[in-house]
Amino acid sequence: PDIVMSGGDVESEYPEDLPVPGASVVYAPSLNANMYRPISVKYSSAYPPISSWTTGNTRIIAYMDGYKPAIKTLKAYQESVNKYGSSTTLPKQAATGRFYTKKIDGRWWLVDPEGCLHLERSATSLRKGTSSRNKAAWNSRFGTDEKWLSTTQRELSEIGFHGTGAFCTGTYSLIQIHNASNPGSPLTLAPSFAFLSQFKSEKSYNYPGGSDDNAAGLVFYNGWAEWCDSYLAGSAFADYLRDPNVLGFCSDNEINFSSNSSRILDRFLAINSSNDPAYVAAKGFMDSKGVQSVTDALNNEFAGIVAEKYYKAVKEAVMKVDDKLLYLGTRLHGTPKYMEGVMRAAGKYCDVISINYYSRWSPELTTAIADWASWADKPFLVSEFYTKGVEDSDLNNQSGAGYSVPTQNERAYAYQHFTLGLLEAKNCIGWHWFKYQDDDGTDNSSKPANKGLYDNSYQLFPYLSFFARELNFNAYDLIQYFDK
């Protein structure tokens, strides 16, 4: 569909093909009793061709009873936020020159370097595509890094995205150059690292039991905490320390603290070397309990011990080099984000708990998200989520954790639906869409997928952009609506 997003002070109109909603019902799962008229959206966890779709009730702003968007133009949005996309109308907080977290009236917030309340809305993987058409389009549209990043910053900010997340490989330093040259229009950074594999290679260790599934067991190996100290004090972090445009950092990605089919305690006990430190830790834990058989409760407790040893070393190392640098955790995914022991450990040492949130059509407001608030008492950031359109994409879409949906229209509705749920959560301080640009070519072992805000010609997807913009522009107003 043709979507034209008006600029300046011209209001954008809803597209004519907006789905017809059902009758008004109470939105669920929710902590509130807000009414809405649901639209039906098809989705699937399978790769195409999709033989069976699930249909989910979906909430979009257009059909929320009792809510009308406060901000309808780019001009109005730009007048309501600062250069970070933070609110200039909500109560000002102490300005420290850095990002920090604060709980106000039961809701967690980020506070930006200027003291403005900030909801994080960014995109991961801001980097140049490697396919031949990526390269041709980049050269045609930009030609220089400076033009690429200044154009990208402007276009993203004009739909309410103001920064970057993990996996901006080769781009972080370019972003910092852009930020230095354009102090009034920065892109925030939230770089990701791979502490465990780096520790392993620098120490010439093998993975416990020879399996990277057991990478977390490296925290029991000699020198883990000391290595964290030296790594954070070294060249890998030098550029990020004391940079006001750095939101924070993630030290690893999706550590396997357990999965549905594989408990960490079972795995460590199965290591066939009785001298392996991970085995010794697991055996010592079982001996201390006086038991022979692993239970889910014991596994949860042990996973928490492993996670605490991991997070404690990283956080203490951070405090030695830059005590104002926010530690965003390890992008928890799958089973680990539902494990009380892991979440309690993360809450003890992380400033923000990053979560890659997949396999749920709606945020779990009354269950998992409430648990995170109770267990961790720290805010969470959704560090990955997306859907991929499989019927109007030129990619094979044979990879990726995000749901398949039919077209770009459903991607747009899914964005609003999921983020509206996140805005209801008083412990959520924002989200990072995965990702900046579609896969292409040989990405994901030649299984590229439609994940991007941008297509492979560096053009924003119009329908997704329209609905993301409406939500992002009104995010602060929506928080007031949900909190009233």
Question: What do these predicted regions represent?
Answer:
Residues 36-39, 43-183, 198-245, 297-300, ...:
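Active-site-adjacent substrate/metal-binding segments within catalytic domains
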Residues 113, 211-219, 239-341:
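Polysaccharide-binding and catalytic clefts of secreted carbohydrate-active enzymes
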Residues 115, 249, 318, 353, ...:
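Conserved, mostly hydrophobic/aromatic
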Residues 176-213, 244, 251-287, 441-456:
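Aromatic- and acidic-residue-enriched segments that line the glycan-binding/catalytic groove
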Residues 203-215, 376-415:
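Active-site clefts of carbohydrate-active enzymes
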Residues 247, 385, 400-453:
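Substrate-binding cleft of secreted/luminal carbohydrate-active enzymes
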Residues 268-272, 434-484:
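Aromatic-rich peripheral "rim/lid" segments of glycoside hydrolase catalytic domains that contact
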Residues 301-316, 322-400:
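Glycoside hydrolase catalytic-domain groove-lining segments
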